[in-house]
Amino acid sequence: MKKRIDYLSNKQNKYSIRRFTVGTTSVIVGATILFGIGNHQAQASEQSNDTTQSSKNNASADSEKNNMIETPQLNTTANDTSDISANTNSANVDSTAKPMSTQTSNTTTTEPASTNETPQLTAIKDQATAAKMQDQTVPQEANSQVDNKTTNDANSIATNSELKNPQTLDLPQSSPQTISNAQGTSKPSVRTRAVRSLAVAEPVVNAADAKGTNVNDKVTAKDFQLEKTTFDPNQSGNTFMAANFTVTGQVKSGDYFTAKLPDSVTGNGDVDYSNSNNTMPIADIVNDKNEVVAKATYDILTKTYTFVFTDYVNDKQNINGKFSLPLFTDRAKAPKSGTYDANINIADEMFNNKITYNYSSPIAGIDKPNGANISSQIIGVDTASGQNTYKQTVFVNPKQRVLGNTWVYIKGYQDKIEESSGKVSATDTKLRIFEVNDTSKLSDSYYADPNDSNLKEVTDQFKDKITYKYQNVASINFGDINKTYVVLVEGHYDKTGKNLKTQVIQENVDPATGKDYSIFGWNNENVVRYGGGSADGDSAVNPKDPTPGPPVDPEPSPDPEPEPSPDPDPEPTPDPEPSPDPDPDSDSDSDSGSDSDSDSDSDSDSDSDSGSDSDSDSDSDSESDSESDSDSDSESDSDSDSDSESDSDSDSDSDSDSDSDSDSDSDSDSDSDSDSDSDSDSESDSDSDSDSESDSDSDSDSDSDSDSDSDSDSDSDSDSDSDSDSDSESDSDSDSDSDSDSDSDSDSDSDSDSDSDSDSDSDSDSESDSDSDSDSDSDSDSDSDSDSDSDSDSDSDSDSDSESDSDSDSDSDSDSDSDSDSDSDSDSDSDSDSRVTPPNNEQKAPSNPKGEVNHSNKVSKQHKTDALPETGDKSENTNATLFGAMMALLGSLLLFRKRKQDHKEKA
């Protein structure tokens, strides 16, 4: 605020001499004084120059230190701020639209483009699932078409042109009949659709979800029967068990009953579910309307079927049904041909049976002394886990003959490569070779336990004798042998959907002659049987319309899979429109004592979407007494009309080393959209009229349009090199034009998403003479998104060193026209030095007789140093004074005498 100065500056009065009209004598007196103290006047003048220069330098230093100078009040601030506020409003509209567009392009959950694409992805996924289910359904549909008749069928090997080789496979021109007799193998006659499709893996199935109670005590099984009790498992032989069941009383969804198989029997046969939770899916038990009455699974390890009732039974009574399930041999538990107990437990009721396994002998080959002999069996196919593996057992020379130059070929196909899904290669096939100690102990079922003491692993001896030079064929050179070998094959098949067909061939010669070439082969193909059942019950709620269960055919009907319906895409939830904070008068009178060394590491993780309750976790030690009431709940759309006329003359010496990430919205009463949540607690919001030259190298990426026309005279060179990386998507449209040169070194990485729609109307008339030295070291790492529209009238009293703003106007008009006519004949020796000295009187404030003027910090200092120089020496020259006095006395006498004479003459 400009102080009134009603007296002339020292620089204008420094050499002036007061003149008084006292007659002729005044000339003599003036001359006497001039001659008497002339030298001292020069010294005083010189001293005054030094003083003035020193004062000027000090003032300059103070100016640099305080970063503030006195400026007149800006009356246009309110109007300018209003304009800025209006612009800010329109800018906020644009700013809001831009982030929405960006989010739309980048964020899948909200952008329209992604929403449009989602149904396509879902549809593809559902389509794949549907295809998967369809493939799975086809074999089940073919279940009842299995022809269990077994016939002998010759497999011609002579047509294997792929393996012709003069050295190793010089096949004899024997007739098909001869080869058929030698081969002696039989092949099951099955309809094509009865063979498992290997197009896709079956889904991995968990055990039926039996959340309810075991109701075996309510289920009664009857009419149990086995389709047959004798069969050859090595020729795809199996049987079916069928039974009727009834449920007594009421059961509910989740209740279940069980059926358990004996050791000698399995429900999965040669299909491997070890990689699928050891759980095999069973066809659902359905009624004539294809409604599922019970779901069933089979546990491979415990050999237990679990039938779990569905919601269908909740309102039904007299439930009855029938199931038919295929049974196979357990090759490990029934390794030899013979009759085994097959006692089957259904709902805790035992049904005793006997099953006879007539395994076709694995000891097969050409019937002559050096005839080739070999056989094999696929004993496990993984169709459920998606790993597409199979296991095969090969018996080499099971007749234990003496053979020369023996070669064995393991093929992933039979006649044509393209007709099989088998894959045999160095990467797809693992071979383990065992030497048999006692051939008589070989199993009829082709089961071979690698840990059996009858088997000795010799795989390492054949490392250099196994090759894959023919396509889809593994060749093993056994050389001259007289023992039996077991080869365990772990292979893979592809996903073409073709049947898995394999073939093994052995060729050899008579070791004695090197002639008498012999060759024998064996084919394998995996066949799968399916089972199912049906059931129904009487309606408990509508006894007038009973729906008795129809008789169940032993061959189940397939349960069509329901068509999957794509999940609807969720509608994106729009973000609520922010409601403006009603005139948040955020009277932040921040007393900013702020000597704040505010290290403010304030990691103010304020990703705060500028709800800016500016809780800014500011660890800042900043002792900033900043009474800044600014709870800055500054809901950021705050239309903060802050007409704050804050005259703040605060000398705010605030040494607060403020590294001021403070977006220094300078003109800082300026509604201080001052993103400057500057955690610097340095409260360097300091109303700092801030011309704030604040060097703001501020890399502050902050989009803050901060148009704060902050006239901020605050010459504050606040060198805050603020590298403020402020990824702050700080939509802070806060038009704060912040001329603030704020160098703000605050490395404030501020990822603050501060949407800061701050309408900051900031009419702040902020006269802010605030000398706010604001050195605030506030390291302000403050990520503080705080769009705080905090009207922050922060008068930044900041430690205010307000040095006595005593407006000491010193209007002392002391005219002292002392017309001392002195007609007094009084011989007045009055040394009337006329020390009336208006100059001295003008320099004194009327209220301070000692002349120690105590003006405000900005005026008084300058006037102290600019006081008029002493124009005389206190140790006056006595001679000069005496001489002057004598001359004055003489003049007085002469004047007195002349007047006396004049008086006499008049008389």
From Swiss-Prot:
Segments of skewed composition (Pro residues): 545-555
Species of provenance: Staphylococcus aureus (strain MW2)
Gene3D superfamilies: 2.60.40.1280, 2.60.40.1290
Bias (Acidic residues) ranges: 556-831
PANTHER family tied to this protein: TOL-PAL SYSTEM PROTEIN TOLA
Compartment(s): Secreted, Cell wall
Residue ranges with Basic and acidic residues bias: 863-876
Site (Cleavage): 197-200
BP-aspect Gene Ontology terms: cell adhesion
Name listed for the protein in its UniProt record: Clumping factor B
Known role: Cell surface-associated protein implicated in virulence by promoting bacterial attachment to both alpha- and beta-chains of human fibrinogen and inducing the formation of bacterial clumps.
